[in-house]
Amino acid sequence: MVPVIALVGRPNVGKSTMFNRLTRTRDAIVGDLSGLTRDRQYGEAKWQGRSYILIDTGGISGDEHGMDEKMAEQSLLAIEEADVVLFLVDARAGYTAADQMIGEHLRKRNKRSYVVANKIDNIDENLARAEFSPMGLGDAIPVAGAHGRGISQMLEIALREFPRDEDEPEEGVEVEEVAEGQEAKRIPGPSEKDGIKIAIIGRPNVGKSTLVNRMLGEDRVIVYDEPGTTRDSIYIPFERNEEKYTLIDTAGVRKRGKIHEEVEKFSVVKTLQAIKDANVVIFVMDAREGVVDHDLNLLGFALEAGRALVIALNKWDGMTPGERDFVKIELERRLFFVDFADIHFISAMHGTGVGNLYQSVQNSFKSAVTRWPTSRLTQILEDAVSEHAPPMVGSRRIKLRYAHLGGANPPLIVIHGNQVEKVPKSYVRYLENTYRRVLKLVGTPIRIEFKGGENPYEGNKNTLTDRQVNKKRRMMSHHKKADKKRRDKR
């Protein structure tokens, strides 16, 4: 399970600056989903091989009578969702009554919490530690979030109890090569014993629970149904047609008589963790509402994680032909960026079309974890360049030399060449589409990474055989005799 870290504290103590530094800004996947997250912002980050989910809160304010429950609501929810709480305080402002209130709340919740003394620039660290020691949460960790000072120490302390990622190759490490002439293979992953892990995600009230219960119908073999904590999703291994799957339910599996709730509880943390743990994501939408902005935000989660994707338009029954045509046009217009994903029109309540989801799940998973030999990927690259060469950069043309597989789920193709940093986005899309078409990839995003530098074979010397050595000597002797004859004639 991916750990969750919450940043809490008074307003203006540097939480957002810290959030942006840890997520590198562009890694933040969602911010301020109206009506769902309000003052909380979620992002993914990674430090020394450990992935984690980061929650930024809007701030907690308090007075001598206690914390303002309305203003602190989202921050308190973030504390409940978190495995670790980083309690930011302002070292310049010193220890305040609001800090005391927050510290008391954290002690009562018995959460793993660390005081982080931010804005430590030009301030004695020992004095800062001493000032915040009365909170009883241990020594404060001195940092300067704006300049990155002390960040490594803070993360080392916060994440030391959590293991490193196991399902992703280290940066720069190639996946195992496939022998020349050998067929493409599936890459076995850590989830093999439980089969394909499927995450069911979507906005509240689109029918996720109904779909989960339909997929776990009487003709399925449910191995067990063991819920985790209130924050955890439910992992349910089951079998269908002798194929193993593990369903990750973010809404919670309910008995058939209890699935008709007005509003499902929505948790961004559950969604992020489910996507991170899954091999394939089934994204559920309400066909009657069409594509809304919240759908696009949630799709961004799956794309950022690079997971294989299947889209299910639920509540398709009961719609008129005109309404269905309009929805299809909207899908084509607004979901063009996930045109690689299969779209199914289903009714989870009645079971219409649900069985077809499994074939798309299988196809998407196979595309996401298949590996190909370097020779195959390089040949596709050469054919693509031959058909449509990269553009000129000044008086020189970009040269793409060879390609190899750099990772899976999603497939990562690493292309080596010269001036690769100048490859335009349009040409990257052309290469992505070419690889997708030739390799017949469905349901998975594909990523291309460029690497420049020298030829890796430069400096290698060929070792001549004895026959080649003797031939070389004869040729050199012949040339010497010919040169001598020309000189004698002069």
UniProtKB/Swiss-Prot annotation:
Biased composition (Basic residues): 470-490
Keywords: GTP-binding, Nucleotide-binding, Repeat, Ribosome biogenesis
Region (Disordered), start-end ranges: 452-490
Domain EngA-type G span(s) in chain numbering: 3-166, 196-369
Family: Belongs to the TRAFAC class TrmE-Era-EngA-EngB-Septin-like GTPase superfamily. EngA (Der) GTPase family.
Subunit structure, as described in the record: Associates with the 50S ribosomal subunit.
Protein name, per record: GTPase Der
Natural source organism: Pseudomonas syringae pv. syringae (strain B728a)
Gene it is expressed from: der
